[in-house]
């Protein structure tokens, strides 16, 4: 005979589910080293000893020009690459070299963004109850969440969660996850950190793999942090955004279009030419499922924090939905000034939007 469990929703439990999570602070950080996209092809082919590949170099230059990215911040410097020549070939075994750099640098870059968010929040660091750390690379145990706990001096009792290898999906996924944590843990103040360093994907050119050139042109390094909680304390905390609902949709038969695979040579990248059109063709169905419960069907009536995988994606989605030029402006600006920051990108865009809103109010 199966046991029977009776659960009663008490007044205290009911209150726990009232109200939405609020984003209370945002901080961003980038490495001091940066590259100009206009001159990057010359640097890239020189540092990888590939200047003899003239046609390939010109092809890469065209890709960089079409990307509409102006600058990218990178941890990788010429000095570091000269010390690690195995990073500059296409397929030499180099995972150990990459890991040694990432395991050290990812938490440090995350700390910079976290400190800015904590400073803006204005509350004692001891009030942070949860930490969620996200990165696409640098897998280690204890993880970057543990290292950041030490770097920041968080309470030893802080509840930690480490998310590895989530890629561009992770920015929105972190918002969804932190909403659940903040709303279902009374008094929670959750620190979320997305720290991305693209060393794992850097490598020399290959005559057979054009996808690799796109990867070398597209991704930048950066970290972003946010503090989220429910029921902000008047006069002590200032909410920036309200997280009303979250949704996620898998588009069937699309998993072959975008793939990243961790190998001895680092993280390999495949992106089919169909990605922009596949996203554009399916985005409205996803929006309908997410916004229909709220009676919203005018896509120009809402503000957009759209992850800009690349300019072709932004252009196709904008055209498909008939969006005005200002709807995706923040996404375009972040892509132009930083490149694709994978999980950190969405938080950079949120930061850009709140800054613009504050400026408009003035």
Curated annotation (Swiss-Prot):
<comment type="similarity">
    <text>Belongs to the thiolase-like superfamily. Chalcone/stilbene synthases family.</text>
</comment>
<comment type="pathway">
    <text>Secondary metabolite biosynthesis; flavonoid biosynthesis.</text>
</comment>
<comment type="function">
    <text>The primary product of this enzyme is 4,2',4',6'-tetrahydroxychalcone (also termed naringenin-chalcone or chalcone) which can under specific conditions spontaneously isomerize into naringenin.</text>
</comment>
<dbReference type="InterPro" id="IPR018088">
    <property type="entry name" value="Chalcone/stilbene_synthase_AS"/>
</dbReference>
<feature type="active site">
    <location>
        <position position="168"/>
    </location>
</feature>
<dbReference type="InterPro" id="IPR012328">
    <property type="entry name" value="Chalcone/stilbene_synt_C"/>
</dbReference>
<dbReference type="InterPro" id="IPR011141">
    <property type="entry name" value="Polyketide_synthase_type-III"/>
</dbReference>
<dbReference type="GO" id="GO:0016210">
    <property type="term" value="F:naringenin-chalcone synthase activity"/>
</dbReference>
<protein>
    <recommendedName>
        <fullName>Chalcone synthase A</fullName>
        <ecNumber>2.3.1.74</ecNumber>
    </recommendedName>
</protein>
<dbReference type="InterPro" id="IPR016039">
    <property type="entry name" value="Thiolase-like"/>
</dbReference>
<dbReference type="Pfam" id="PF00195">
    <property type="entry name" value="Chal_sti_synt_N"/>
</dbReference>
<dbReference type="Pfam" id="PF02797">
    <property type="entry name" value="Chal_sti_synt_C"/>
</dbReference>
<keyword id="KW-0012">Acyltransferase</keyword>
<keyword id="KW-0284">Flavonoid biosynthesis</keyword>
<keyword id="KW-0808">Transferase</keyword>
<dbReference type="InterPro" id="IPR001099">
    <property type="entry name" value="Chalcone/stilbene_synt_N"/>
</dbReference>
<dbReference type="GO" id="GO:0030639">
    <property type="term" value="P:polyketide biosynthetic process"/>
</dbReference>
<dbReference type="GO" id="GO:0009813">
    <property type="term" value="P:flavonoid biosynthetic process"/>
</dbReference>
């Amino acid at each position: 005979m199966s046991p029977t469990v009776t659960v009663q929703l008490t007044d205290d439990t009911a209150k726990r589910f009232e109200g939405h999570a609020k984003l209370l602070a945002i901080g961003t950080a980038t490495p001091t080293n940066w590259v100009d996209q206009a001159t990057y092809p010359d640097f890239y082919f020189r540092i990888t000893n590939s200047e003899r590949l003239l046609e390939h170099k010109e092809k890469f230059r065209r890709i960089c020009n079409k990307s509409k990215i102006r600058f990218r911040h990178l941890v990788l410097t010429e000095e570091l690459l000269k010390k690690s020549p195995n990073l500059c070939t296409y397929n030499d075994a180099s995972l150990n070299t990459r890991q040694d750099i990432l395991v050290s640098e990812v938490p440090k870059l995350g700390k910079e963004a976290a400190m800015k968010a904590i400073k803006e929040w204005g509350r004692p660091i001891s009030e942070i109850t949860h930490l969620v750390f996200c990165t696409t690379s640098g897998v280690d145990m204890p993880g970057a969440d543990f290292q950041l706990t030490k770097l920041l001096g968080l309470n030893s009792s802080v509840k930690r969660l480490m998310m590895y290898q989530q890629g561009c999906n992770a920015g929105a996924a972190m918002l969804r996850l932190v909403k659940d944590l903040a709303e279902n843990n009374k008094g929670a103040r959750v620190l979320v950190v997305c720290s991305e360093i693209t060393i794992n994907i850097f490598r020399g050119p290959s005559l057979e793999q054009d996808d690799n050139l796109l990867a070398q042109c597209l991704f930048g390094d950066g970290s972003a942090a946010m503090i989220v909680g429910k029921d902000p304390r008047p006069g002590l905390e200032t909410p920036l955004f309200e997280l009303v609902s979250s949704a996620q949709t898998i588009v069937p038969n699309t998993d072959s279009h975008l793939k990243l695979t961790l190998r001895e040579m680092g993280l390999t990248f495949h992106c089919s030419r169909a990605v922009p059109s596949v996203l554009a063709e399916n985005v409205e169905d996803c929006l309908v499922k997410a916004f229909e419960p709220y009676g919203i069907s005018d896509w120009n009536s809402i503000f957009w924090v759209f992850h800009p995988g690349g300019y072709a994606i932004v252009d196709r989605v904008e055209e498909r939905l008939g969006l005005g030029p200002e709807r995706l402006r923040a996404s375009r600006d972040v892509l132009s000034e930083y490149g694709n920051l994978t999980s950190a990108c969405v938080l950079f865009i949120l930061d850009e939007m709140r800054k613009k809103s504050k400026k408009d109010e003035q």
